């Protein structure tokens, strides 16, 4: 295998994981902060807010997992060879 392609695949895999985790990380922090603020304002709505928060956190985390899948594909099933 060409060493330049191999090096580019490793760099691209690192960027895929790194960039794929920035957005969901910021989004999860914002969502959790807003959920805590909403629970503090209306404690009686805690169950509904928590359920919505957990569902939205799962969807946000899926984006990071997609980045990991792309990185693993670049590392082990290299499409550029």
UniProtKB/Swiss-Prot annotation:
Protein family: Belongs to the ATPase C chain family.
TM region positions: 3-23, 57-77
Main location: plastid
Signal peptide as annotated in the record: none
Gene: atpH
Keywords: ATP synthesis, CF(0), Chloroplast, Hydrogen ion transport, Ion transport, Lipid-binding, Membrane, Plastid, Thylakoid, Transmembrane, Transmembrane helix, Transport
Molecular function via GO: lipid binding; proton-transporting ATP synthase activity, rotational mechanism
Gene3D superfamilies: F1F0 ATP synthase subunit C (1.20.20.10)
GO (cellular component) term, any one: proton-transporting two-sector ATPase complex, proton-transporting domain
Record's miscellaneous remark: In plastids the F-type ATPase is also known as CF(1)CF(0).
Protein name stated in the entry: ATP synthase subunit c, chloroplastic
Physiological role: F(1)F(0) ATP synthase produces ATP from ADP in the presence of a proton or sodium gradient. F-type ATPases consist of two structural domains, F(1) containing the extramembraneous catalytic core and F(0) containing the membrane proton channel, linked together by a central stalk and a peripheral stalk. During catalysis, ATP synthesis in the catalytic domain of F(1) is coupled via a rotary mechanism of the central stalk subunits to proton translocation. Key component of the F(0) channel; it plays a direct role in translocation across the membrane. A homomeric c-ring of between 10-14 subunits forms the central stalk rotor element with the F(1) delta and epsilon subunits.
The organism of origin for this protein: Gnetum parvifolium
Residues of the site described as Reversibly protonated during proton transport: 61
Compartments, record wording: Plastid, Chloroplast thylakoid membrane
Coiled-coil intervals, chain numbering: none
Subunit structure: F-type ATPases have 2 components, F(1) - the catalytic core - and F(0) - the membrane proton channel. F(1) has five subunits: alpha(3), beta(3), gamma(1), delta(1), epsilon(1). F(0) has four main subunits: a(1), b(1), b'(1) and c(10-14). The alpha and beta chains form an alternating ring which encloses part of the gamma chain. F(1) is attached to F(0) by a central stalk formed by the gamma and epsilon chains, while a peripheral stalk is formed by the delta, b and b' chains.
Source organism, top-level taxon: Eukaryota
UniProt topology in membrane: Multi-pass membrane protein
NCBIfam families in the record: ATP_synt_c, PRK07354.1
């Amino acid at each position: 295998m060409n060493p330049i392609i191999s090096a580019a695949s490793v760099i691209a895999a690192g960027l895929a994981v790194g960039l794929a985790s920035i957005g969901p990380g910021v989004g999860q922090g914002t969502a959790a902060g807003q959920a805590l603020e909403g629970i503090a304002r209306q404690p009686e709505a805690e169950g509904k807010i928590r359920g919505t928060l957990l569902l939205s956190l799962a969807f946000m985390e899926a984006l990071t997992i997609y980045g990991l899948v792309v990185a693993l594909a670049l590392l082990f099933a290299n499409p550029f060879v």
